């Protein structure tokens, strides 16, 4: 039985992971759950899974949860704050840690789990793309393992040789007869929109993905295709891939989740219905597979599968992320921080959809940070850029 801690249990990934655990109680046991401030969902999760520990980032939410658990006579211990979250990520009794906290807030807890030698099931791509070198170095020195949850990287992982699966980031694609990886993306809800149409889209429209059910932040990132740019960076680190070894392909139907081109001409792809439970369950059960109750593909009902190259003019955030990766770790940290503020501001209806790119581009172009020498440097860059981005948003409002 695998013992699980979930960082971000009240979000989309966490809720889906728990649904898989609920259907496979003989395979998994929940040890600890971590969330920000949604005590209502956390209370229900405690009632269903009886974790030993819970941590809420928000102190007020932790206080309310303690009262409700006591009233329900549930013995789960409630902690609060970043230090306690990092402690739960490193619990000795935990085998696997699902890293699903949204954004930069997931960095330190994920690193804590890595330093403790856990198997990390990674959904929080921001922790990897902002601290890539330090992240991969910590993996190597601690003996921790990493399995991606993102559907694209999980799809690639599924069709890679076992040697790479066991040693992500430590070997090269060429040594394993791989010519390149193909990251697919749906193009989001706006891939047919004109530039003028994009100026007027609403947060609700941006969060209405045609194929996937996701959280708000990643839904907006999908709509701008920033998400695909971040996934490009994630793939560069995870698979130790060169720039020439990653291709990006728009695939609106979201049936083929990614592909691996081998030197012998074989192109291996992972296909499934667009349901994140497939990749979560594979990460949780690897190297085995378990039942998820995800619908099977019915090829008689699939009229066609379409593909085309991404248009960087229509999706400038994608190009921005690819270029930022080539510039170094500081640039990726800057872009990630600026984007988190810009997306949050759009969701709060403070800025228009097209301003997300403008803010990202202006902050990235105007920032000049030395390459980070440690995690603290990354956190400091992140802190300063968030201030710059918030000031930029304010200047657009007033």
Swiss-Prot record:
The gene is dxr. Pathway: Isoprenoid biosynthesis; isopentenyl diphosphate biosynthesis via DXP pathway; isopentenyl diphosphate from 1-deoxy-D-xylulose 5-phosphate: step 1/6. It is an enzyme of class 1 (oxidoreductase). Its cofactor is Mg(2+); Mn(2+). GO terms for molecular function: 1-deoxy-D-xylulose-5-phosphate reductoisomerase activity; manganese ion binding; NADPH binding. Mn(2+) binds at residues 150, 152, 231. It comes from Buchnera aphidicola subsp. Acyrthosiphon pisum (strain Tuc7). This is 1-deoxy-D-xylulose 5-phosphate reductoisomerase. The keyword Hydrolase does not apply.
């Amino acid at each position: 039985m695998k013992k699980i801690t979930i960082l971000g249990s009240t979000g989309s990934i966490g809720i889906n992971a728990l649904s898989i655990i609920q259907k496979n109680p003989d395979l998994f046991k929940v040890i600890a759950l971590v969330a920000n401030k949604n005590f209502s969902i956390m209370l229900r999760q405690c009632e269903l899974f009886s974790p030993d520990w819970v941590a809420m980032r928000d102190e007020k939410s932790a206080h309310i949860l303690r009262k409700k658990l006591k009233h329900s006579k549930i013995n789960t211990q409630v902690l609060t704050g970043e230090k306690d979250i990092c402690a739960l990520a490193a619990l000795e009794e935990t085998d696997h840690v699902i890293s699903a906290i949204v954004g930069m807030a997931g960095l330190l807890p994920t690193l804590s789990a890595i330093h403790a030698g856990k198997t990390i099931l990674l959904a929080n791509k921001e922790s990897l793309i902002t601290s890539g070198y330090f992240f991969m170095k910590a993996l190597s020195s601690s003996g921790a393992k990493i399995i991606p949850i993102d559907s694209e990287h999980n799809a690639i992982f599924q069709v890679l040789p076992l040697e790479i699966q066991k040693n992500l980031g430590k070997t090269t694609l060429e040594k394993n007869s791989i010519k390149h990886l193909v990251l697919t993306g749906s193009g989001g809800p706006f891939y047919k929109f004109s530039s003028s149409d994009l100026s007027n889209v609403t947060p609700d429209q941006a969060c209405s993905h045609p194929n996937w059910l996701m959280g708000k932040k990643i839904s907006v990132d999908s709509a701008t295709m920033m998400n695909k740019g971040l996934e490009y960076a994630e793939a560069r680190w995870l698979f130790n891939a060169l720039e020439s070894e990653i291709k990006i392909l728009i695939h609106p139907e979201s049936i083929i989740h990614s592909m691996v081109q081998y030197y012998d001409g074989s192109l291996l792809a992972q296909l499934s219905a667009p349901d994140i439970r497939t990749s979560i369950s594979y990460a949780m059960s690897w190297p085995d597979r378990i039942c998820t109750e995800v619908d099977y593909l019915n090829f008689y009902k699939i009229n066609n599968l379409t593909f085309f190259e991404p248009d960087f003019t229509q999706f400038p955030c994608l190009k921005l992320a690819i270029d930022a990766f080539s510039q170094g770790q500081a640039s990726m940290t800057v872009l990630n921080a600026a984007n988190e503020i810009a997306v949050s501001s759009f969701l709060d209806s403070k800025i228009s959809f097209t301003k997300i790119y403008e803010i990202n581009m202006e902050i990235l172009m105007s920032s000049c940070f030395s390459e980070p020498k440690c995690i603290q440097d990354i956190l400091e860059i992140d802190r300063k850029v968030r201030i710059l981005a918030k000031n930029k948003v304010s200047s657009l409002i007033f």
